[in-house]
From Swiss-Prot:
Domain text: Consists of three domains; the N-terminal catalytic domain, the editing domain and the C-terminal C-Ala domain. The editing domain removes incorrectly charged amino acids, while the C-Ala domain, along with tRNA(Ala), serves as a bridge to cooperatively bring together the editing and aminoacylation centers thus stimulating deacylation of misacylated tRNAs.
GO biological process, one term: alanyl-tRNA aminoacylation
Domain of life: Bacteria
Protein family: Belongs to the class-II aminoacyl-tRNA synthetase family.
GO cellular component, one term: cytosol
Cofactor-binding details, from the entry: Binds 1 zinc ion per subunit.
Keyword Secreted included in the entry's annotation: no
Record PANTHER family: ALANINE--TRNA LIGASE, CYTOPLASMIC, ALANYL-TRNA SYNTHETASE
InterPro entries: aa-tRNA-synth_II/BPL/LPL, Ala-tRNA-lgiase_IIc, Ala-tRNA-ligase_IIc_anticod-bd, Ala-tRNA-synth_IIc_core, Ala-tRNA-synth_IIc_N, Ala-tRNA_ligase, Ala_tRNA_ligase_euk/bac, DHHA1_dom
Protein name, as recorded: Alanine--tRNA ligase
């Protein structure tokens, strides 16, 4: 048997990229795990996920042959992670892709060459088998020509790839035979390549994307056929390194060794503990990379995924005897393992560790809170005469507090109870179905638009320097089809051979303006990039009939453009000020640059304080008032990075980039339009700062005249306040503080008076106390202003009556407030304030509850308050 090459994970990755680069492929950088332009995805979950724009025809790539190593996250099988050899939440997918270029034959032959050639991976061909779709005769023939025996070419009906609407097609897979040690039972019906077994490991998958699926079962041939190939790095590492699981490769073992060092336990000595080692190693990779790409733990979306993963790892760490925050200590190890291809984890290690440590500390506190909730749930069940914790409650504890089912089961057993595990599984299945439906809905690609894809005629953009240009309409479209004319009032799309109109990009909105022909006028409503990179104008024919091939004059609306450029340059200054004030972890997470305002979304852990906002605003204005020259250069991307240019989070750049510098203060890669000097911006004013999601903040601001109007509005408000307060504008804060002091004194006097009145009324209520079967009972409607006053009166009565059951109610408008008290000696006799108040409240249209000694409730029907209070006597008699 041919020996295996002992390649490291880094060598396997680099060899894959080098091989396909030698076959004319362009290397596509690994995209951020946080999707930038795809709201349908929670995470980038495959190598092809970042290339959908190429496959559905929205964008034509410069090179139709692409290769990448894409970091990915999938969490749909999280419960299997650590328990199987190959389930992961974070993994790398190596892929080679053809967008309308080579197809089946080259894809298969190149895959075989890379896998079997001694120059590359050098696998033994005798240990490889393939699967194909039963109707894919072309693939079968190619495999036979490569020397694969017919008995190792297995037809499988499942070899057809589709994810809803869009491109689809048959696929072929390559399997590696790990040997009889992983399965040698001739009676095992699953022991074949493609079956459920451990012996035959899938290492390669090629999708022949040749159909468009309309989502209704109809398939049509794609005008341009595509190739989508995937090879999992972790799986391939387990093959080349000849180890039983992915976790035993050099991609995981350094993390496991570090965990051994922290825990004092040894990997591979106890099967149950091995699961814990694997879970921790997997989850820290996911969390470290995701935080490095801008995601932060939270209670929603991708932030919730991170929170669950961290909490799951912490729970498994308890099996290893680790009872303190420790995951953050593994970040440096993750960074060192992956640094060859992913430098961002080491670069952001301090921030990543701070976030993880904070989350771990919070979870250790949450565990105590969860136990308190679990105790309440169990007690409530017992109070209702039940000895089972419902599946819904168990799942809520799991989903909200990170409590595993087994922990809830252990607790229940300690309290002579059980858990509805079937109900828990049903709740879990429902959540998975919802998640699966969301993935299927969001994973599909758009159908190819052949009309736009075939528009390859060049168009020159002159808008960086000119706001007007004489041009020619080189393509005119109406309802998606090429036409020769479009009538007045109709909407159309067109290309110009020369255009001053900027196409929406990088958050900067498109220019507006007019296009004037010999006998027609067009209003430009929008400009977007066409698949082949030209600026595609959406217009409405204001007058006349728009004609293809007509000579026209294109004019950008100057005042709007001027305002947009001010706001765009201001976003660059804001980005720099944010990093200077909050930290280098700040990354742009989205932006909108319009004529009216700018909006800047950025990653940050926690709210921005008023002091920090003031510093940020001041720094931006200082840069504006410094009259910094804004210079624009085109250079090699390596030179740009050496110059210190900020590459925007999630963006992909070619070899030549456009660098926008505002003096030495701000240097960014940007294709947008800017002022020539920061002084043109005039003034910068932040109007709002808020959180918009997990670890993402948003600042909205205005510049120039917009900033003046905002500040003038603030001044007018201040002057109006001064008039109302009858003081000078400079003395408004002091006057307000004085009024607040007066108000607090008045409130204290009011509260004191209320307390005295309550005491007087409480004293008079003693005459209304009833004796029922030897128990003092007081149930009375009283006249107080709010719940606080009602509780104060209750405290007075409890003190004076001693052993008693008291229920007080008050009505304010259409609202009822209720409080109940049961003294300790009567609790021992079976009386319960929470149960009593619940019954009283239901009789006046409300609800509530509480402890055995004290409870409160509300109602919505004041007319029934006295009737409800009368129930108290019945309650006492029923338990006598």
């Amino acid at each position: 048997m041919k020996p295996l090459k002992p390649l490291t994970g880094a060598q396997i990755r680099q060899m894959y990229l080098d091989f396909f680069q030698s076959k004319g492929h362009a290397i596509e950088p690994s995209a951020s795990l946080v999707p930038i332009e795809d709201p349908t995805l929670l995470w980038i979950n495959s190598g092809v996920a970042t290339l959908k724009k190429y496959f559905d025809g929205r964008v034509i790539p410069q090179n139709p042959r692409i290769v990448n190593a894409q970091k990915s996250i999938r969490t749909n099988d999280i419960e299997n992670v650590g328990k199987t050899a190959r389930h992961h939440t974070f993994f790398e997918m190596l892929g080679n892709f053809s967008v309308g270029d080579y197809f089946r034959e080259d894809a298969i032959k190149w895959g075989w060459e890379l896998l079997t050639s001694d120059e590359w991976y050098g696998l033994d061909p005798d240990r490889l088998s393939v699967t194909i779709h039963p109707e894919d005769d072309a693939a079968r023939q190619i495999w036979l020509e490569l020397g694969v025996p017919a008995e190792r070419i297995i037809p499988l009906e499942d070899n057809f790839w589709e994810i809803g609407e869009g491109p689809s097609g048959p696929n072929t897979e390559i399997f590696f035979d790990r040997g009889p040690a992983f399965g040698d039972d001739p009676n095992d019906s699953e022991l074949y390549p493609g079956g459920e077994n451990e012996r035959y490991l899938e290492i390669w998958n090629i999708v022949f994307s040749q159909y468009n699926h309309d989502g209704h079962g109809n398939y049509t041939e794609l005008p341009r056929k595509n190739i989508d190939t995937g090879m999992g790095l972790e799986r391939m590492a387990s093959v080349m390194q000849d180890v039983p699981t992915n976790f035993d490769t050099d991609l995981f073992m350094p993390i496991i060794h570090k965990t051994e060092e922290i825990s004092g336990k040894r990997y591979r000595e106890d099967t149950k503990l091995d699961v814990a080692f694997k879970v921790i190693a997997d989850h820290i990779r996911t969390v470290a990379f995701a935080i490095g790409d801008g995601a932060l733990p939270s209670n929603e979306g991708r932030g919730y995924v991170l929170r669950r993963l961290l909490r799951r790892a912490v729970r498994y760490a308890k099996m290893l005897g680790i009872e303190r925050p420790f995951m953050y200590e593994l970040v440096d190890t993750v960074g060192s393992v992956m640094v060859d291809f992913y430098p961002q984890v080491p670069e952001k290690a301090d921030f990543i560790k701070r976030v993880i440590k904070n989350e771990e500390e919070r979870f250790h506190e949450t565990l105590h809170d969860g136990l308190a909730i679990l105790n309440t749930v169990a007690q409530a069940a017992k109070n209702n005469g039940e000895h089972i914790i419902s599946g819904e409650d168990a799942f809520r504890l799991y989903d909200t507090y990170g409590f595993p089912l087994e922990l809830t089961v252990e607790y229940a057993e300690d309290h002579q109870m059980s858990v509805d595990e079937e109900g828990f599984k049903r709740a879990m299945d429902e959540q998975r179905k919802r998640a699966r439906a969301a993935r299927e809905d969001g994973g599909s690609m758009q159908q190819q638009s052949e009309v736009l894809a075939t528009l390859t005629v060049p168009s020159q953009f002159v808008g960086y320097t000119d706001l007007e240009a004489d041009a020619k309409i080189i393509a005119l479209l109406h309802d998606g089809e090429r036409v020769t004319e479009v009538a007045a009032g109709e909407e159309a799309q067109l290309l110009l051979d020369v255009t001053p109109f900027y196409a929406e990009s990088g958050g900067e909105v498109a220019d507006s303006g007019t296009i004037t022909g010999p006998d027609f006028v067009l209003d430009v409503k929008d400009v977007q990039k066409a698949p082949n990179g030209q600026n595609l104008h959406t217009v409405v024919v204001r007058t006349g009939i728009a004609l293809a091939d007509a000579s026209v004059h294109a004019a950008v609306e100057a005042s709007s453009r001027q305002a947009i450029t001010k706001n765009h340059t201001a976003t660059h200054l804001l980005h720099k000020a944010l990093k200077d004030t909050l930290g280098t972890h700040v990354n742009q997470a989205g932006s909108l640059v319009s004529a009216e305002r700018l909006r800047f979304d950025f990653s940050h852990f926690g709210a921005v304080t008023a002091e920090e906002l003031a510093t940020i605003e001041q720094d931006v204005n200082q840069a504006i008032w410094a009259s910094l020259a804004v210079e624009i250069e085109e250079m090699n991307i390596a030179d740009a990075k050496a110059k210190g240019a900020m590459a925007l989070f999630g963006e992909k750049y070619g070899e030549t980039v456009r660098v926008v510098s505002a003096g030495t203060y701000s240097i960014e890669l940007c294709g947008g339009i800017h002022v020539r000097n920061t002084a043109e911006i005039g003034l910068f004013k932040i109007v709002s700062e808020s959180g918009i999601g997990a670890g993402t903040r948003r600042i909205e601001a205005v510049t120039g005249a917009g900033a003046y109007h905002v500040m003038n509005g603030h001044l007018q408000t201040l002057e109006q306040a001064a008039r109302v307060l009858k003081t000078k504008t400079t003395e408004v804060p002091g006057r307000i503080e004085a009024l607040q002091v007066q108000l607090r004194e008045t409130e204290r006097a009011h509260e004191s008076l209320q307390a005295k009145l309550a005491n007087i009324e409480a004293a008079s209520l003693k005459d209304d106390v009833e004796q029922i079967n030897g128990v003092q009972v007081l149930a009375k409607q009283v006249d107080v202003s709010d719940m606080d006053a009602l509780r104060g009166m209750m405290d007075e009565l409890k003190s004076s009556l001693g052993s008693a059951i008291i229920v007080l109610g008050s009505a304010q408008g259409d609202k009822v407030n209720l409080v109940a008290s049961v003294s300790k000696d009567l609790i021992d006799q079976g009386y319960h304030a929470g149960k009593l108040i619940k019954e009283v409240a239901t009789r006046c249209g409300g609800g509530g509850g509480g402890r055995p000694d004290m409870a409160q409730a509300g109602g919505k029907d004041p007319a029934k308050l006295n009737e409800a209070l009368a129930f108290t006597s019945h309650y006492v008699q029923s338990l006598a």
